[in-house]
């Protein structure tokens, strides 16, 4: 249970305004090109940022879970719930099944670039209508 809580906290720190919106949208000539076509090196599974490989332990790391819970309480809980319920941003339940650890870490620490380039982040922004503010998370805070 603590592992799930920890992963959920990490995921929601990174995926602040996320949604599992699978609605297909047609591209028109007036829309900007997708990040993949504009930047062939862009990896939508990884996102935009410095994290390219994040190792996730198969067992719960209690110290990280406790630290992550503190970060969530101070910087995330005013906008995000640990359930599916949307507050200002989306609920965090299931975020690790929708996004990779790398994507979550990059979103948490590089929010503006992700919102500018990532189609999933842009779709979340359309639903939430509020850009997630930069929380100035350290790498360790984002990882916990």
Residue ranges and their predicted role:
Residues 1-15:
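Sec-dependent bacterial lipoprotein signal peptides
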Residues 17-21:
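Bacterial signal peptide processing site
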Residues 25, 29-71:
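Electrostatic cytochrome c docking/interface patches
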Residues 64, 72-75, 83, 131, ...:
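Short pre-active-site segment immediately N-terminal to redox-active cysteine/selenocysteine motifs
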Residues 65, 80-110:
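Gly/Gly-Pro-rich "capping" loops immediately C-terminal to redox-active cysteine motifs
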Residues 89-90, 125-132:
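Surface-exposed aromatic
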Residues 102-107, 130-144:
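C-terminal capping alpha-helices of c-type cytochrome domains
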Residues 105-122:
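Short Fe-S-cluster ligation motifs
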């Amino acid at each position: 249970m603590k592992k799930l809580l920890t992963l959920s906290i990490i995921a929601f720190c990174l995926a602040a305004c996320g949604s599992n919106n699978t609605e297909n949208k047609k591209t028109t000539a007036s829309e900007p090109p997708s990040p993949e076509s504009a930047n062939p090196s862009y990896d939508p599974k990884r996102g935009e940022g410095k994290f390219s490989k994040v190792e996730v332990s198969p067992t719960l790391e209690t110290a990280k879970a406790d630290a992550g819970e503190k970060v969530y309480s101070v910087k995330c809980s005013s906008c995000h719930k640990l359930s599916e319920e949307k507050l200002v941003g989306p609920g965090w339940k299931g975020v690790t099944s929708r996004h990779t650890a790398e994507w979550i870490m990059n979103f948490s620490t590089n929010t503006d670039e992700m919102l500018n380039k990532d189609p999933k982040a842009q779709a979340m922004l359309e639903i939430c209508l509020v850009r997630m503010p930069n929380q100035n998370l350290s790498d360790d805070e984002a990882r916990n």
